[in-house]
Curated annotation (Swiss-Prot):
Post-translational modification as stated in the protein's UniProt record: Extensively phosphorylated by FAM20C in the extracellular medium at multiple sites within the S-x-E/pS motif. The phosphorylated form inhibits hydroxyapatite crystallization. Dephosphorylation via a mechanism involving ALPL/TNAP promotes hydroxyapatite crystallization.
Protein name: Osteopontin
Span(s) of short sequence motif Cell attachment site: 144-146
Localization of this protein: Secreted
MF terms in GO: cytokine activity; extracellular matrix binding; integrin binding
Origin organism lineage: Eukaryota, Metazoa, Chordata, Craniata, Vertebrata
Primary residence: secreted
Chain intervals with Polar residues compositional bias: 48-61, 121-130, 197-216, 234-249
Known function: Major non-collagenous bone protein that binds tightly to hydroxyapatite. Appears to form an integral part of the mineralized matrix. Probably important to cell-matrix interaction.
Modified residues annotated as Phosphoserine in this record: 24, 26-27, 61-62, 75, 77, 80, 106, 109, 112, 115, 118, 176, 180, 200, 209, 213, 219, 228, 231, 234, 238, 243, 247, 250, 255, 260, 271, 283, 288, 290-291
Top-level taxon of the source organism: Eukaryota
Residues recorded as bearing Phosphothreonine in the entry: T170, T175, T222
Length: 294
């Protein structure tokens, strides 16, 4: 309730305040309403003054057209315009002098624009004549980690003997030359590899010799792998044979026990139930052992 009362009070105060009427008229209309007589005379132009102002402009425009038809260069036309402007300035009043200068300045600006466009076309043509050729780049394997090996491989692949260098050479000569070049390259590569693979300590020497032997003789590794596979196969076969022999021995031993026990049962006819139980047990053991062997 308090808020509602406060809002109504504010609305009442706002409505009681005086409202100013906005004046939508322009500044000229305001001045005219305040001072009607002098401003009306200033705003309404005199027709005689208009004719005096337009006459020199028409004369200058006609003379400019004639000069433009007769002369082609912009510099001469500018000079003629300057002379004509001087004559007009001597004849006209101060107001006419200012307006004629404005018209001449506008004409000179137009001509300067035309001259600038002509200069731009000339410079564009000269720039178009000069054309720089595009030079292709060549990929060089510099900065690579395997630059030495990469360069040697590229040399060995791109080594070709042309007929122009050796016109009288035969195929045999070319092949011998190729072989000699490859042998030279291999001889050059061997000391570099030796220097790179040379360690500082004796342990490193042993490891380096072992690695070099592995690299030089890859057949040893394959032979070792084959030998290890053969040894594993032979061990597996021997284990199978041993298991079979042991199973056979156990079966024989159990059968021997069974026969001996059977003989005892024949001698002792009172223990028939025990014999049945033993037979069932022995048969079960035999079946389990046979299943294990299989």
């Amino acid at each position: 309730m308090r808020l509602a009362v406060i809002c109504f009070c504010l609305f009442g105060i706002a409505s009681s305040l005086p409202v100013k009427v906005t004046d939508s008229g322009s500044s000229e209309e305001k001045l005219y309403s305040l001072h009607p007589d002098p401003i009306a005379t200033w705003l309404v132009p005199d027709p005689s003054q208009k004719q005096n102002l337009l006459a020199p402009q028409n004369a200058v425009s006609s003379e400019e057209k004639d000069d433009f038809k007769q002369e082609t260069l912009p510099s001469n036309s500018n000079e003629s315009h300057d002379h004509m402007d001087d004559d007009d300035d001597d004849d006209d009043d101060d107001g006419d002098h200012a307006e004629s200068e404005d018209s001449v300045d506008s004409d000179e600006s137009d001509e300067s624009h035309h001259s600038d466009e002509s200069d731009e076309t000339v410079t564009a043509s000269t720039q178009a004549d000069t054309f720089t050729p595009i030079v292709p780049t060549v990929d060089v394997p510099n900065g690579r980690g395997d630059s030495l090996a990469y360069g040697l491989r590229s040399k060995s692949r791109s080594f070709q003997v042309s007929d122009e260098q050796y016109p009288d050479a035969t195929d045999e000569d070319l092949t011998s030359h190729m072989k000699s070049g490859e042998s030279k390259e291999s001889l050059d590569v061997i000391p570099v590899a030796q220097l790179l693979s040379m360690p500082s300590d004796q342990d490193n020497n042993g490891k380096g010799s072992h690695e070099s032997s592995q690299l030089d003789e890859p057949s040893l590794e394959t032979h070792r792998l084959e030998h290890s596979k053969e040894s594993q196969e032979s061990a597996d076969q021997s284990d199978v044979i041993d298991s079979q022999a042991s199973s056979k021995a156990s079966l024989e031993h159990q059968s021997h026990k069974f026969h001996s026990h059977k003989d005892k049962l024949v001698l002792d006819p009172k223990s028939k139930e025990d014999d049945r139980y033993l037979k069932f047990r022995i048969s079960h053991e035999l079946e389990s052992s046979s299943s294990e062997v299989n």
